[in-house]
A protein has these predicted regions:
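A translation/RNA-centric and nucleic-acid-associated enzymatic feature enriched
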Residues: 1-29, 33-37, 63-223
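A common structural junction motif
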Residues: 38-45
Length: 223
């Protein structure tokens, strides 16, 4: 894969991505599959679920789940649950990235992402303000991103329209309106869950490397 982004010890414009999808399954089943796959990969290399990554001791035998809102609330003692409930989704995500993300050392599936920051994800049946989505963090780094695919063409068109408004107001990460995709959804798509894993970061973790350049065949990052 390619992204027009800068170089760092955690990012490279060219990187390896593993994506997998399954129809007629649940988010919880996909979370379990992802956890077992990572455990198996580590055991094959390290013969243990307890590994070292840089200065951190990581226990891959103990994955947990936590909601994004609860994690933000726990790290920001000046905020109340009412503050969180009233907060814009983009602001909540920004707080998470700035105050929580790098503290998620042990394997954590973060769930409960706001719909505003999940434009391709299906709404949760019990709470339509959040998406059926997870991100997996290990060692303070995002390893995987997965969600139930949004297969409602009307909802998807509405989400794209909101993304266009965000782009017009300066959001550089907002998406354009993909009319072809909406038309494809109108022809029908089964319920499905998809996951993307950054293979380079996963290899970094399993082999205890602290720079992405050490797991790339042709790194652009200088020593």
């Amino acid at each position: 894969s390619f992204r027009n982004e800068g170089l760092s010890t955690r990012h490279n414009p060219e990187f390896t991505m593993l994506e997998y999808y399954e129809a007629f399954t649940s988010l919880s089943n996909t979370i379990e599959f992802t956890e077992n796959m990572i455990k198996t990969a580590s055991k094959k290399v390290n013969e243990s679920e307890k590994i070292k990554w840089g200065d951190d001791e990581i226990d891959l035998g103990n994955f947990r789940q936590a909601s994004l809102a609860d994690l933000v609330l726990a790290e920001n003692k000046d905020l109340t649950q009412d503050d969180i409930d009233k907060m814009d989704g983009m602001k909540l995500l920004e707080l998470f990235e700035n105050s929580v993300e790098d503290k998620l050392i042990q394997p954590t599936f973060v769930i409960g992402y706001p719909v505003e920051v999940s434009p391709l994800s299906r709404r949760n049946n019990d709470n339509p303000e959040i998406a059926d989505r997870f991100e997996l963090f290990i060692g303070g780094k995002e390893i995987a991103n997965g969600f139930c695919e949004l297969n409602d063409p009307d909802d998807q068109a509405e989400r794209f329209s909101e993304q266009v408004k965000a782009k017009d107001t300066g959001d550089k990460e907002a998406m354009s309106f993909d009319e072809d995709y909406v038309i494809a959804l109108e022809h029908g798509m089964p319920p499905a869950v998809g996951v993307g894993i950054g293979v380079d970061r996963l290899v970094m973790m399993i082999t205890n490397q602290t720079s992405i350049r050490d797991v790339l065949l042709f790194p652009q990052l200088k020593s």
